Amino acid sequence: MFKNVFANLQKVGKSLMLPVSVLPIAGILLGIGSAHFNFLPDILSQIMAQTGGSVFSNMPLIFAIGVALGFTNNDGVAALAAVVSYGILIQTLTAVEPIVLHTTIEVIKNKHLSDTGILGGIIAGAISAYMFNKFYRIQLPEYLGFFAGKRFVPIISGLSAILIGVILSLIWPPIGHGIQIFSKWAAYQNPILAFALYGLVERALVPFGLHHIWNVPFQMQIGEYTNSIGQVFHGDIARYMAGDSTAGNLSGGFIFKMYGLPGAALAIWHTSKKENKTKIGSIMISAALTAFLTGITEPIEFSFIIVAPVLYVIHAILAGLSFPLCIFLDMRAGTSFSHGFIDFIVLSGNSHHILLFPIIGILYGLLYYILFYLFIINFNLDTPGRENIKNNILEKDNNEIAPYIITALGGKNNIKNLDACITRLRITVSDISKVKQKDLKNIGAAGIIISGSGIQVVFGTRSENIKTAMDECIKNI
């Protein structure tokens, strides 16, 4: 049972990556536009702010589409059904809640009592995905043949959304009230404790690929800010971009991603065997630069998470502490995606105490370096370079390594589903015993996670391109 739940949660995490992928461009537009830089004409700032803001305002709908696509192998009909479901779901809530709460529609709209936020989008996406998978091959009588098959999906999804909307209108008031209480506590009353918990749990979930689910309420839901033209923004990311001075509580990510983990990478390099230092140095420096520039840290984390889990425990604790540290020092900076130098510079317009970031960051990197160095040496941990290294073939291009990966996964016929997120391949196989983990490691996988018939293979930022190359290779086999 747990394996099935884990597999489904992986699908949820993967499906949430599509909506998240629009955040960088939306965040840059909104962040720069809201900062009102002197070198930008006012009209250009307004255009950037409003276009970026429009994306954040429609995030529930975008999440509905993302969830629908994630559970239906990117079928466009499911996306259309998600749009229909979301619109009907929200309007049903708006119509029924006045009866349930004994108030008027105007009060419902003014107080956002029917605003389900991201959760409403996820529910609508789940409705359309379920209906698609159940009915996309449905046969109808000949006189209704036009509505058979996939054309039936938006219809049944919309009708189902009415029923779900009525049910949701009965249970949403206490749920919404609970979310508001948590939101106020996390964003305004005790952000130090809330974001310490966020940082610790978020890193703990990274090995399982489930951190995207945990990110959503903090990044997209907590807190509320209304700008000068009446646009309402939820979540720490959007509120910061829109100019909310109380947002920016996610700033701790810059400390451990841009400075902490690169310090750990240097420690791994410096503790490697003499004969391996050149190879490990090139790998770790490349991974450190990736973390510093983009905030993508899995290439470093998966270099030690399997062979030295105690180091990952230390890392998760330090990552969790970086968030309350920044909040305590009133250090605020915005991220659109993953806490890298690019985000840090581009979105610096609304930042606070920005010069403290490199100072605290370098100290944090030094702390990481010392702790990792001491633990590796004193406990003789088998981090990369401290054992005999076999040459792998990852230096080949994506098209060349794709056949090797397919073979290591048990061949074309053993692969039931193939997908990828930012740093890892997500695969479902027919027979897990046919998967050759050792071969995947020799190819260059930074980490491998198996649960039931699901397997995640970490190849860093090349994963999406490797997946595309594998798709082409599978078609031609």
UniProtKB/Swiss-Prot annotation:
Protein keywords: Cell inner membrane, Cell membrane, Kinase, Membrane, Phosphoprotein, Phosphotransferase system, Sugar transport, Transferase, Transmembrane, Transmembrane helix, Transport
Reaction(s) catalysed by this chain's protein: N(pros)-phospho-L-histidyl-[protein] + D-glucose(out) = D-glucose 6-phosphate(in) + L-histidyl-[protein]
A Pfam family that the UniProt record links to this protein: PTS_EIIC
Main enzyme class: transferase
InterPro entries associated with the record: Glu_permease_IIB, PTrfase_EIIB_Cys, PTS_EIIC, PTS_EIIC_1, PTS_Glucose_EIICBA, PTS_IIB_1, PTS_IIBC_glc
GO BP annotation list: D-glucose transmembrane transport; phosphoenolpyruvate-dependent sugar phosphotransferase system
Top-level taxon: Bacteria
Domain PTS EIIC type-1: 1-388
E.C. number: 2.7.1.199
Domains: entry comment: The EIIB domain is phosphorylated by phospho-EIIA on a cysteinyl or histidyl residue, depending on the transported sugar. Then, it transfers the phosphoryl group to the sugar substrate concomitantly with the sugar uptake processed by the EIIC domain.
Role according to the record: The phosphoenolpyruvate-dependent sugar phosphotransferase system (sugar PTS), a major carbohydrate active transport system, catalyzes the phosphorylation of incoming sugar substrates concomitantly with their translocation across the cell membrane. The enzyme II complex composed of PtsG and Crr is involved in glucose transport.
Name of the featured protein: PTS system glucose-specific EIICB component
Species assigned in the record: Buchnera aphidicola subsp. Acyrthosiphon pisum (strain APS) (Acyrthosiphon pisum symbiotic bacterium)
Organismal lineage: Bacteria, Pseudomonadati, Pseudomonadota, Gammaproteobacteria, Enterobacterales
